[in-house]
Amino acid sequence: CHNLWLQYRYSMDESILRNTVYPTLRRAINFYLPFLEEDGQGILHLKETYSPEYGNAKDCNYDLALLRWGCLTLLEACRILSINDELCPTWQHIADKLTDYPQNEDGMMIGKDVPYNRSHRHFSHLLMFYPLHLLNAEQEGSKELLEKSVEHWHSLPDNILGFSYTGASLLYAAFGEGNKALEKLNGLFALTLRPNTMYMESGPVIETPLSGAQCVHEMLLQSWGKKIRVFPAVPSQWQDVRFQDLRAEGAFLVSAIRKGGKTTDIRIKSLAGEPCILQTDMENPVVKIGNAMLVPQGKGVY
């Protein structure tokens, strides 16, 4: 469902939202409703569910993150599509009252009373950081929690595989940590690249190379939260970088150039006429082509 939502966001094709995303996500989220129970303080908890390839847990972080994101996204879809769904109050109640993510001194847990204490290749328990961005760099304390969680995840090395390195790279990139993102991506290369430059790990799977490519995309361009971030997590050793026509949410094509560690040129083409909010390290940028107006909002946001 999240991938379907991104398909809509990158195209802004409302028919995708109405005919595919909304009905599919509605069914997926409503499946969770019988698993919810309310405590004496009115907080909603999940009964025992399964964290992929790890085990069972109540208040499983994997499901809490997806449920919270799903309810918020359904409410947004109803607003966009002008749908008065009878379940909107239920989804809003869940979004308001769903319990916090279980965590301990090592960061995010698998679920209630289930710490992360054996090696695991997936970052299923960290989806709230990426790709859902429910916890993100714009929130106080989230970065420290992310770093603690990733470091603990990789501190148990027995089942840390290629996908673990790309996952950590994506998580660090989401929080603007370009050097750490590159370090983890290089970990993938050291583990899985062969002398002929081809990837090989265990079976005939492709998700690790694809997520490796996505690591580079996330270093160069991010657009979650309806804000285009150009070069948000570029490693310090990448002093000269350029990309052309990468897609951003809101149906934008973005190109940019970075020289000597500074962004010198950004070009944005709107394909759907959506509002454009840009974050950049450019000092006092000016519009040279087109009739767009830059309105400073502080901290490099226009």
Positions of predicted regions on the chain:
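Residues that flank catalytic or metal-binding motifs in active/ligand-binding sites
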Residues: 42, 63, 125-127, 242, ...
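Active-site core of glycosidic bond-cleaving carbohydrate-active enzymes
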Residues: 1-15, 19-23, 64-227, 264
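A glycine-rich phosphate-binding loop feature that marks nucleotide/adenosyl-phosphate handling sites
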Residues: 47-49, 91-96, 231-238
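An acidic- and aromatic-residue-enriched active-site/binding cleft used to recognize and process polar
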Residues: 5, 12-13, 21-22, 30, ...
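Acidic/histidine-rich catalytic neighborhood
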Residues: 26-80
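Detector for glycine-centered tight turns/loop "hinges" at secondary-structure junctions
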Residues: 41-42, 106-107, 251, 261
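Acidic surface patches and DE-rich sequence motifs
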Residues: 38-39, 104, 270
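Non-catalytic C-terminal accessory modules of carbohydrate-active enzymes
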Residues: 179-302
